[in-house]
């Protein structure tokens, strides 16, 4: 069976979204990820899929790996870079932990190139609906919730401008 979220069309992944293109909602993309990920019944294969998702992440420079961009409360070093251009939020991230980087890659894929309003209204619960929550520590789970809150708080601040 073709996995839509875990095996995106490379041609679509490379191009920039414009406001006239129809993109699935965050909830729909998240549901695809949950379905695709839950179809994989082997933890090592699930882990491999997460690692593959990190290949599409835009790099974070060493200069950007600073305290301002660092997520506190996460066991691993994790940096999130948020920007806003032409009405769209852009997300870049990096971590020294591959599992954290993989999970953040999913979060970034769901939120990147969205309007602040879309991001603010999203309910992200893929960690609870996949075996990922069982595979990561409570601290890492809370760290991922912090990432989601940071992105949504940033988006909320943009809607109040």
Regions found by a protein language model. Give the residues of each.
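N-terminal amphipathic/basic-hydrophobic helices that include classical n-h-c signal peptides
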Residues: 1-18
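Positions in alpha-helical segments
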Residues: 35, 105-106
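A short interface-forming secondary-structure element
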Residues: 95-96
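Alpha-helical support elements that line or immediately flank enzyme active sites
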Residues: 106-114
């Amino acid at each position: 069976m073709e996995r839509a979220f875990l095996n995106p069309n490379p041609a679509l992944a490379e191009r920039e979204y414009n406001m006239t293109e129809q993109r699935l909602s965050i909830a729909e993309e998240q549901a695809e990820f949950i379905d695709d990920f839950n179809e994989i019944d082997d933890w090592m294969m699930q882990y491999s899929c997460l690692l593959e998702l990190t290949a599409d992440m835009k790099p974070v420079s060493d200069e950007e790996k600073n305290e301002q961009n660092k997520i506190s409360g996460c066991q691993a070093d994790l940096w999130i870079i948020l920007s806003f251009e032409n009405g769209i939020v852009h997300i870049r991230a990096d971590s020294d932990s591959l599992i954290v980087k993989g999970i953040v890659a999913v979060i970034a894929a769901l939120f990147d190139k969205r309007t602040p309003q879309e991001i603010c209204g999203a309910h992200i619960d893929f960690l609870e609906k996949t075996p990922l929550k069982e595979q990561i520590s409570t601290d890492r789970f809370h760290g991922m919730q912090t990432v989601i809150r940071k992105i949504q708080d940033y988006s909320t601040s943009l809607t109040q401008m």
